[in-house]
Amino acid sequence: MRQYTLSFLFLIFSRFCFSQALYFPPNTGNNWDTLSPSALNWCPTKIDSLYAFLDSNNTKSFILLKNGKIVLEKYFGTHTQNSNWYWASAGKTLTAFMVGIAQQENHLSLSDTSSNYLGLGWTNCSPTQEEKITIRNQLTMTSGLDDASGDPDCTIDTCLEFLANAGSRWAYHNAPYTLLDSVISQATGMSLNSYFTQKVKNPIGMNGFYFYQDYNNVFFSTARSMARFGLLLLNEGNWNGNQILTDQDYFTEMTSSSQSLNPAYGYLTWLNNTNQFMAPYSQIVFNGSISPDAPSEMYAAMGKNGQFINIVQSEDL
């Protein structure tokens, strides 16, 4: 059986509609309003079965929000409300969100060649090939760099070989994504952690930090902080009246098909409303959606070993 180390997940138990204004927890302290499952007509035995399933699969923590309020919150083993845990590739969506902020502040444009920020020769491609790689290509996994050439996480120039013209091939490739961290830093003049703290962390009351591990820059936080970011996504970049991501066109693009090669991928965000999708580390096009049992409108930040933030806007989940 696959072992999950699930850091956070929005899960739908029913399509029962309980619409009301979104609630936002205070930016400081531990207070967070709750909503009883019984108020939503959810079955207690199914919740017990869910917790048993999560526990048997090595889950660390699980939170479900409805209208911004906590309906379910469960920690397993030694994991607690104050425990930090890695987001894995779910952190990609957080990075995409910050790229949007950097663009709205005129620090960069998605159509810019990445070389403007990473310097000439950041790849092992020819100058002409390299110049065609843009920030948008990094956001959409369409850099054209060879993801099967050695270590796919390696960000050293000699690891980044040409395989196809930028925009012509989709491949889940960590290295070009990771280099967006340097793009943000060079464009804004701030370290990635400092930019995150100023633009996202403090405005919504998160904790968390990026931490370099080998070639990867991995984000860590508590489950509740992950929930805060999920709530920010649910409200399209607005936190309790504070419009953090003002570029709504960017938010729409981030949570919509970004290219036709893999329609289930936006800007470092997975989409469930498509009839075909490609999976990481494969060139096979699969029929169906990434999560056929979930509502088609769901979009998700997804990381290995079950690090998920799933958003269903019509249900305020």
Which residue stretches match the model-derived regions?
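Bacterial Sec-dependent N-terminal signal peptides
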Residues: M1-A21
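N-terminal pre-domain segments of enzymes
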Residues: A21-L40
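A short, well-structured edge-of-sheet supersecondary motif
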Residues: L50-H79, I309-N310, D316
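Active-site SXXK
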Residues: G68, W85-S111, Q138, L180-I184, ...
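Active-site helix/loop module of the DD-peptidase/beta-lactamase fold
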Residues: E105-S143, M190-T222
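A small/polar active-site loop signature that marks catalytic segments
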Residues: T140-Y212, N216
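Penicillin-binding protein/beta-lactamase superfamily catalytic region
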Residues: A164, S194, G205-Q313
